[in-house]
Amino acid sequence: MTTSSRSRSSTVAAATLGEDDLSSNAQKERRKRILDATLALASKGGYEAVQMRAVAERADVAVGTLYRYFPSKVHLLVSALAREFERIDSRGKNPPGRNPLERMQLILSQITRAMQRDPLLTEAMTRAFMFADASAAAEVDQVGKLMDRLFARAMTDTEPTEDQLAVARVISDVWLSNLVAWLTRRSSATDVANRLELTVELLLGDGSRRPE
């Protein structure tokens, strides 16, 4: 998802019930079960396996209830992706490293390897994120902000500046495009690692390395 597509208008946005919209523990638990069911189905069969009726059955909720929480499978999968990034972000720790370059390389490597360990799930979440329309703009924006914040945290121990957030956004876009290239077998895992390393060195390094 490019920066421009991330910022599309949300004039036709459909309502997904997030954690903050749920008043009872039972509702929050139901939402968790729905997302857990979505991840389990996607992990076994990819994007096509995530059907609303199958999710409802696995989560033990009525189909009508599922639609009140998530209007479509795209909303489901993008929300599941957001939850995965929230889990990483909630740890609240900067990755080890002597400087921003080392920390950024480490966090990119960790996230990329985690995604590559479950290619069907990654394909499903990434496909939904890439092709979400304006109705899922709020969910897409949430994922984008989580990625930007996660990568910006590698650059500073304090609140990131606008410049740092801009760099993080570039890295987010490069990371996502390379993840898609790996999923579609246009790039190997080694190719992805090399490109990400070069990107980080060009943006955060001392300028000594140039692309060959």
Curated annotation (Swiss-Prot):
Pfam family, one: TetR_N
Alphabetic keyword roster: DNA-binding, Repressor, Transcription, Transcription regulation
Classification via InterPro entries: Homeodomain-like_sf, HTH-type_TetR-like_transc_reg, HTH_TetR, KstR_C
DNA-binding annotation, residue ranges on this chain: 51-70
GO MF term list: DNA-binding transcription factor activity; transcription cis-regulatory region binding
Annotated region (Disordered), positions in chain: 1-28
Span of domain HTH tetR-type: 28-88
PROSITE patterns hit by this protein: HTH_TETR_2
Biased segments, Low complexity type: 1-11
Biological process, per Gene Ontology: regulation of DNA-templated transcription
Keyword RNA-binding annotated: no
Gene3D superfamilies: Tetracycline Repressor, domain 2
Quaternary structure and interacting proteins, as annotated: Homodimer.
PANTHER family per UniProt: HTH-TYPE TRANSCRIPTIONAL REGULATOR RUTR, HTH-TYPE TRANSCRIPTIONAL REPRESSOR KSTR
Described purpose of this protein according to its UniProt entry: Controls the expression of genes used for utilizing diverse lipids as energy sources.
Protein name, as recorded: HTH-type transcriptional repressor KstR
Gene encoding the protein: kstR
